[in-house]
């Protein structure tokens, strides 16, 4: 008897989530560790209370099909979500250097914008764990626009929430 279509879809979703947990290639992971650096998820796990992290947009991938970027790893190079520090809710993003050198592209920026907006809307601290190469030049001006959105949100949050 064949699996139920829903079971197949849930299995596919689980495989995608597992792939997202290990988005960067093994050689990039090894280079980070050889430099004594933690990976993006390791930094989040180290910073937040154990088991408190809730990830947002884990399966997001870039849309820059015309840019020549063939690889489309999940997370698009940034992990976003919320958790707690000593029981207090905080929002966090952590750039993943193993995916495109942690360079900011359009979807990457949208994920940061979203988590920053959520932090501001609930009055919770916003934590950025940065380890990136700057703008993803292959995506052109949309990368720079992404930085503009981050800076604008920094200004809007200034004096309102810790960041």
Regions found by a protein language model. Name each.
Residues 1-163:
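Terminal-region recognition feature
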